[in-house]
Amino acid sequence: MNEIPNHIAIIMDGNRRWAENKKINKIIGHKKGIEIAKNIAIESHKIGIKNLTLYAFSFQNWNRPKIEVESLFKLFNDLFEDKSKFFKDNGFVFNPIGRLDELNNLMRKKISRLHENTIDNKGLTINVAINYGGKEEIVDTIKKISCAGIDFNLLDVDLLKKFSYLPKTPDPELMIRTRR
């Protein structure tokens, strides 16, 4: 049986350790991770994968040293500004997920612009998780259900999915956590 998964999710972990082991700047490790993610997206599309989720910055990453967080967000800032060509050239959809409302205004605008500029593309959908945490998504989902006035006695897996960050995207069939 050689079925291609519809949805692959990758927890992008180990870029910093890779750079430390090579005795180079950590931000170079993160840049290398982005280049690898781009290659994964291209190859995923070539073999027929429809959805790719990249966990890029977790809610817990805020606990890293301030200089590292600032460097990462400068990298994200540049990425969202420069990569619209990457998404356009490949026909990819950029779909951001996470607590985006907690990001600074400039970052939210760039994320929104990239999403809007790619929403009609027909290729691979790349869900990029920024300021994301699984527990936080559960809390946000429950809050949305509560705001909708739905009786919690009706709560089931399908209802949770309907109010999740990716209600129309199938769950990942393959989850990968990279390491050094």
Give residue ranges: language-model regions.
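Flexible, compositionally biased loop and terminal segments
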Residues: 1-180
